[in-house]
A protein has these predicted regions:
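Long, distal/terminal scaffolding or interaction modules
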Residues: 1-187
Length: 187
């Protein structure tokens, strides 16, 4: 699919599909791309509240996204250079790598497992609660109460801006380049 437009009237575009490549396309339907396998997107504009649920093996590059519940319960995501705005994104994702992205989203990465976020900006409250084996490397993390109830959490060379009440009941190994407003040491 190339140089196309799927408007908001295209409610449930591309379900149960495999081996799809989508380039320079607008995906504006509410439930685009569900339960698909082996998907590549490049240069796409996505406005879809329930985009990418239960997707397996998706590569996304140079895309802009507005979504709620983005990529719910998906795995093997390889994302590069995304601009994303929304909430409740990346919940329950597994085995994924996200690089050179800007995410402005609350409640992101809840219950994520085996995920690496690298060279990115992640802005939003309640980041990555209940995650397991998630690594943030060379990232800027902005927002209240991030990274609570985590197991095997790693922060490598990260900045934390306006972050308070961090790391509640988390198992964390961190190298942080900035001060942190507060750390919640409740056990």
């Amino acid at each position: 699919i190339s140089n196309s437009e799927m408007t908001e009237l295209c409610r449930a575009a591309l379900w149960y599909s495999s081996d799809i490549e989508i380039v320079n396309t607008k995906l504006h339907g509410i439930k685009a791309l569900r339960e698909c396998n082996q998907v590549k997107l490049q240069g796409c504009d996505i406005i879809s509240p329930e985009f990418g649920w239960f997707v397996h093996q998706i590569e996304m590059r140079d895309c802009t996204i507005q979504s709620e519940y983005f990529m719910m319960r998906s795995d093997h995501l390889i994302f590069t250079n995304l601009q994303m705005k929304g909430k409740y994104s990346f919940q329950y994702i597994e085995d994924s790598v996200l690089e050179h992205c800007v995410f402005d989203t609350k409640d992101a990465f809840w219950h994520a497992k085996n995920v690496v976020i690298r060279d990115s900006i992640v802005k939003g409250e309640y980041l990555a609660w209940y995650c397991e084996n998630v690594t943030f490397e060379n990232c800027k993390i902005i927002g209240t109460q991030p990274l609570c109830y985590c197991i095997g959490l790693k922060l490598i060379n990260c900045e934390m801006v306006d972050t308070d009440l961090c790391f509640e009941k988390s198992e964390v190994e961190a190298v942080i380049c900035t001060s942190v407003v507060s750390i919640n040491l409740l056990v």
